[in-house]
Amino acid sequence: MRLGVLDVGSNTIHLQVMDAHLGARPEPATSFKVELRLTEYLDAAGSITPQGIDLLHQAVGDSVAHANENQTDEILAFATSAIRDAKNGPKIIQDINQRHQIDLQILTGDEEARMTFLAVRRWLGWSAGKLLVIDIGGGSLEIASGVDENPEATLSLPLGAARLTRDFLSGDPYTSKGVKFLEEFVSSKLEDEIPSILRAHDANHFVATSKTFRTLARLSGHMFSENPKHLESANLKTMISKLADMTNKSRAELPGVSNSRAQQIVAGAIVARATMNALDLDRVEICPWALREGVVLRRLDWLNN
């Protein structure tokens, strides 16, 4: 079976076409991605602007066309925090589904955390023991912990890298005042919101996933000559200082940092460090599987049952 996973996120509209079969790992076949930072198309009332909606329709239409050109059997389409939190999100979803003949669903933060956790569990296997999984997206932060394929505790907070960059950081390079204020805001938010069940996680394996963490791990490997499959909390403090002092153009020239991510990587690093500190983690392992793989695995499980 060839499945197309259409991820309508805060930074990109990303179609990943995978060959997926019961009992086998999903294998990527082709992908199509449009960079569209939806958080930049929010008006004062919190609605996505007409320009943003037009660009979104174009990106979704091109993605569906790519899926059809590659003989995709089914498109699994989902939207995360950018549309979930937009005032006109439900109307946008309705219009997209009617125009493009797909079934785009809004995932809750809890669903995001659970499906990402499932992907990490399947990647690492049962021998990894109890997992604590962290995922920083463009619009939100998800944390999940548990011993099974279904986490026993999840948390979703509006601490995504794109959202925080838009709300807190200005200048090029960013002002030291803005960076400091963002660090204090994130630390305070985590202190208030992380429940005791996640603080006292007693996990055996600490895992981070998705693009922000992969980029940070690669940068850490470049700056400190370390294994890019792991990320150390101690390195993040130095990285934040260095990255914040650079211009967007200079950050975009670093290994693994695209032009679109160059603006957000400072906020992403701040959230990563604050989250690791709040959970008392010195190091996390980077997992290549995340939400999209979790969506495919959940669909295969449903078909099997």
Predicted regions, residues:
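Short, glycine/acidic-enriched loop or turn micro-motifs at the edges of active sites
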Residues: 10, 138, 211-214
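N-terminal basic/disordered segments at the start of proteins
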Residues: 1-27
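Conserved ATP-binding subdomain of kinase catalytic cores across diverse folds
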Residues: 22-37, 42, 61, 67-68
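Dinucleotide-binding Rossmann-like beta1-alpha1 core, especially the glycine-rich loop
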Residues: 77
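Helical "lid/coupling" subdomains associated with nucleotide-phosphate turnover
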Residues: 3, 17, 41-72, 80-130, ...
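Acidic, divalent-metal-coordinating active-site segment for phosphoryl/phosphodiester hydrolysis
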Residues: 139-145
